Amino acid sequence: MSKVLTSLPVGQRVGIAFSGGLDTSVAVAWMRDKGAIPCTYTADIGQYDEPDVSGVPARAREYGAEIARVVDCRAQLVEEGLAALACGAFHIRSGGRIYFNTTPLGRAVTGTILVRAMHEDGVDIWGDGSTFKGNDIERFYRYGLLANPQLRIYKPWLDPDFVHELGGRTEMSQWLTSHGLPYRDSQEKAYSTDANIWGATHEAKTLEHLDTSLEVVTPIMGVRFWDPAVDIATEDVTVAFEQGRPVALNGRRFDDPVELVEEANAIGGRHGLGMSDQIENRIIEAKSRGVYEAPGMALLWLTYERLMNAIHNEDTLANYQISGRRLGRLLYEGRWLDPQALMLRESIQRWVASVVTGEVTVRLRRGEDYTIVRTEGPALSYHPEKLSMERTSNSAFGPTDRIGQLTMRNLDIADSRAMLEMYAGQPLDQGQVLVENGTLFGELPSGGFDQITENPEVQAEPEEEALDAAAMEAGTD
């Protein structure tokens, strides 16, 4: 049975995730005018595009909201963001830059916390401003139902009556004026913006065209680092981590993680750090483009990743990257709280993040131009004396040890050579073109692989005696 209502539930309370912009303002007024009982819920997620969240409920009541609440979600959002940071839950990379999934993080928090707040008020119908072409409609749908299985969804933008009457911004503003209602006549931008404490998203309109650069965007969390007229002073920043969590910046310890993130944003923002231009695959597998800001997350990530690489071995890091990428896609799809995501999160935080303790100092200049100055911690597996090119008194191994290690490699090198010879003997259209003409080997005469593992000292022995000599005296292996 569908949970989506396609017509206005007259006489019933309808919760609206209310931003105070034109779209949600007219939606509240229109629903009240048509006989529904709108109730507005505004999430305080530290958004940088709304300087006065506390004043939003008063505006909502002007448009007819029976209940108008601000719900502080900053602490929960910061915690989820720190979990994503620890897990490397970032799967989108374009032009050499990472997208830190800041919008999906915000949706995971608002989609659950707001629905819980509505349910406390006896509101079990929810609407928001997401369109049918985007990701948010599915993210909110999933999180909403997980938080309240009784929830039904009503979105004015999926209601033919609403769309027919108020299909565009001009019609919306005219409708409010004709009904004697105010609205914020903000200047029309060349793109749309959505923000929270972790980052800002700029998309749509002119940014849909790939011949329009990132530089048309006016940053709201940072500076125009590409503009030579903007003066940016070089700055050294030290970030301290304990068990995978950032705890201090420049020696100042933060008891409140929200304050730490705000300070990280301020530091990274004044250098233009963490701004990226991404082409991504939406949940429905259609490609879209967004310009993102995440100065604090970028600062925390580059220092966390540096420390992690100094601690964990190659296979752990490889598993971390694979699992983190998968987790990032789950987060993007609105599955951050699903069992498959929780399994990955718990594993990564337990076995990788829990030992990431230490400090990294980075010298920030403009944008992504920075230098790592110092890395230290109590559990680093980086020990320069083990591989020093200078003479050391406590070297971990010597020349003879390395000769033995190289000799053991003969086994798999011989196997690889045998396979290459086999491929080279295949018809041209199967193997020879690739192996002989597509690599550096040239011709590969058969039989070379046997020479790799030959032992001159046992060449005179019969085959059976040689096998006996190589066998274990007891047991099997």
Curated annotation (Swiss-Prot):
Annotated residues for binding of L-citrulline: 99, 135, 139, 192, 201, 203, 280
Enzyme class, broadest EC rank: ligase
Subcellular location: Cytoplasm
Region described as Disordered: 450-477
GO molecular function: argininosuccinate synthase activity; ATP binding; protein homodimerization activity
Designated gene of the protein: argG
EC number: 6.3.4.5
Catalytic activity: L-citrulline + L-aspartate + ATP = 2-(N(omega)-L-arginino)succinate + AMP + diphosphate + H(+)
Lineage: Bacteria, Bacillati, Actinomycetota, Actinomycetes, Propionibacteriales
Binding-site positions, L-aspartate: 131, 135-136
Gene3D superfamilies per record: 1.10.287.400, Argininosuccinate synthetase, chain A, domain 2, HUPs
Family annotation (PANTHER family): ARGININOSUCCINATE SYNTHASE (PTHR11587:SF2)
InterPro entries: Arg_succ_synth_type2_subfam, Arginosuc_syn_C, Arginosuc_syn_N, Arginosuc_synth, Arginosuc_synth_CS, Arginosuc_synth_type_1_subfam, AS_cat/multimer_dom_body, AS_multimer_C_tail
Main localization category: cytoplasm
Native source species: Nocardioides sp. (strain ATCC BAA-499 / JS614)
UniProt KW keywords: Amino-acid biosynthesis, Arginine biosynthesis, ATP-binding, Cytoplasm, Ligase, Nucleotide-binding
Family membership noted in the UniProt record: Belongs to the argininosuccinate synthase family. Type 2 subfamily.
Description of how the protein assembles with itself and partners: Homotetramer.
GO biological process, one term: L-arginine biosynthetic process
Annotated Gene Ontology cellular component terms: cytoplasm
Pathway note: Amino-acid biosynthesis; L-arginine biosynthesis; L-arginine from L-ornithine and carbamoyl phosphate: step 2/3
Taxonomy, superkingdom: Bacteria
Protein name: Argininosuccinate synthase
